[in-house]
Amino acid sequence: MRGILGPVSAALTLAEALEVVRANPSRSAILLDVDGTLAPIVRHADDAHVPEVTRTHLIAVSRRYALVACVSGRRAATARRMVSIGSIAYVGNHGGEILPPGGTVPEVDPEFARAGERVRAFRDKVLDEELHRLRVRAEDKDQIAAFHWRGAPDEEAAEAAVRRIAERAEAEGLVVHWGRKVLEVRPTVQVDKGRGVRRLLREADVDAAVYVGDDTTDLDAFRGLRALVEEGRLGTAVCVGVRSDETPPELEQEADLLVDGPAGVRSMLEALL
């Protein structure tokens, strides 16, 4: 683990790590990934949901802190449906769009929106009978195409097919990104959770921020917050990794603090109150 502003002691408690934001909630932001963080990972992504007790804690946190937002690889509108709290912000498609609190139409990065046509055309081209037979699920996220193999009858064969898709995507000049049993094909326009978080905080009057996530895409958010600290635009960043059987080693290395699964995130939300 890294330190918040230097090395973190292994004995550092959750309450101690969060004291910097608990002491000044009106100047603090709480940012959380959704899948694997607020919502447990499930066999089929469409079945994922945020447990009611977690949602209740998140509502209480949103009433206490200056800014609370969910930062997701899903569309912003999909993330809001999952979380079902309209009074917080949502960063969707890995930073490509932002749905402000109470908003109904996400603000999509114009260049990102234009570039999505190539990804949609690629997705339509690679969908074939083999993917259907292997039960690889293709997800259309407008500007991003995702291919999930979690829960396939033969996950090894399904992953091999998805890796062939990745090779084709790279050959066509598209960007590939791997997550927890999912491949994302993205346009060449650079979007990531770090850029999304920076964009979100640009208008926020906060001195400290906590980010909580479980996957490789969340590392971009960690780095984005730390860059803001280095630039003097944010006083403190606390990066919390959510541990699971599939935790990327880089996440454990870069996190200031680790919690165990969505249940650990729930405890963290309680500690913020």
Question: What does each model-identified segment do?
Answer:
Residues 83-87, 172, 235, 253-255:
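Short, structured coil segments at secondary-structure junctions
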Residues 133-235:
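Conserved acidic, metal-coordinating active-site core of Asp-based
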Residues 20-24, 28-30, 57-65, 225:
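A short, Lys/Arg-enriched amphipathic alpha-helix followed by its capping loop at the start of a domain
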Residues 28-30, 88, 209:
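The start of beta-strands in P-loop NTPase/AAA+ ATPase cores
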Residues 2-14, 25, 194-273:
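Mg2+-dependent phosphoryl-transfer enzymes with acidic/Ser/Thr/Gly-rich catalytic loops
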Residues 1-34, 38-42, 46, 53, ...:
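Non-catalytic pre-domain segments flanking phosphatase-related domains
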Residues 38-48, 180-189:
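Glycine-rich phosphate-binding "P-loop"
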Residues 49-141:
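Active-site phosphate-binding/coordination module
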